[in-house]
């Protein structure tokens, strides 16, 4: 079992990897239904079923609420079940043949929702406004990150880093020829959440150095190999902060896993104004903290919407839908 994020709060707004990820699946179950309709709970039950059958699976968590699931991928069946409401996976690739839609809103009792429209709309506006501020702060954090890059760039030998990355990449043994992109870390209402399951049973190499040196190293590594998994940066998803290739892992943070080797990019130069770089790095942290504060307020608004819909749900009907989905996946 491994845990990831396929959507993230970034300096570019909400960054979605679902469309690319789901194209490789044999079947995709798309769950419709708004807040409080039990999508995450249903997916957790599917994961529990997969575990009871001894099947390997992945949990895809929500960056807006890391206690909640956005998806579950049963790897041994190559089937994914995902939240299909905006801003998640919402498109249908091949209806019925590949993609199957289940609407959990069908379990709502409309008679219990009389007179709540204005309240719900006001709470949704409030949530939207909080997210607008979230992305303003993260956009500012991204600008400071690139300021930091520009400062550090003056003191590192970029050509030597790229040449070294090329030599490392040549020794890798890729699995297949596809490139998978995902997040092991996310910017969430409680701060940053990070999982390290992908490092289990891997030879872990810790990559050290200034932020720009690591960016250059991983950018070059990602260009030179297929058959790898790229761990993207939450703040700047156009760059990666780690790579898995077969039994080898190159990461900036090994978490609780002991690293087997270390690559210190500091040997390629650190002749830049460290005080200026540190100031920009601190500004990244500060602006991200402001974003996290707003994310928490957005989550509170979301939870207040759920509180309206949960009492109107017929969860026994959800259980019937669950049985249909389990039959579809497990037979």
Describe every region a protein language model picked out:
Residues 119-172, 281-328:
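An accessory alpha-helical subdomain
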Residues 1-56, 205:
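N-terminal accessory targeting/assembly segments
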């Amino acid at each position: 079992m491994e845990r990831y994020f396929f959507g993230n709060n970034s300096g570019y707004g909400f960054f979605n990897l679902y469309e690319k990820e789901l194209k490789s699946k044999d079947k995709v179950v798309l769950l419709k239904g708004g807040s409080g309709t039990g999508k995450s709970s249903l997916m957790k039950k599917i994961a529990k079923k997969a575990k009871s059958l001894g099947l390997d699976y992945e949990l895809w968590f929500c960056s807006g609420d890391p206690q909640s699931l956005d998806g579950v991928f049963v790897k041994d069946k190559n089937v994914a079940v995902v939240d299909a409401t905006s801003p998640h996976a919402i498109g249908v690739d091949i209806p019925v043949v590949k993609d199957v839609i289940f609407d959990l809103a069908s379990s709502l009792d409309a008679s219990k929702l009389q007179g709540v429209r204005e309240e719900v709309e006001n709470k949704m506006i409030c949530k939207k406004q909080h997210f607008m501020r979230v992305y303003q702060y993260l956009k500012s954090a991204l600008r400071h990150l690139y300021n930091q890059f520009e400062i550090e760039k003056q003191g590192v030998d970029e050509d030597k880093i790229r040449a070294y990355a090329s030599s490392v990449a040549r020794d890798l043994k890729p699995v297949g020829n596809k490139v998978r992109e995902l997040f092991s870390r996310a910017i969430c209402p409680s701060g940053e959440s990070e999982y390290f399951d992908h490092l289990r049973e891997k030879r872990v190499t810790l990559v050290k150095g200034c932020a720009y040196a690591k960016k250059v190293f991983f950018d070059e590594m990602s260009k030179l190999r297929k058959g790898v998994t790229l761990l993207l940066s939450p703040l700047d998803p156009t760059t990666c902060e780690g790579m898995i290739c077969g039994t080898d892992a190159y990461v900036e943070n090994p978490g609780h896993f002991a690293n087997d080797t270390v690559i210190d990019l500091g040997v390629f130069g650190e002749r830049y104004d460290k005080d200026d770089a540190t100031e920009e790095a601190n500004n990244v942290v500060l602006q991200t903290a402001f974003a996290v504060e707003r994310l928490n307020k957005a989550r509170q608004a979301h939870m207040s919407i759920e509180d309206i819909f949960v009492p109107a749900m017929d969860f026994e009907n959800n259980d019937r839908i669950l049985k249909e989905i389990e039959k579809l996946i497990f037979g």
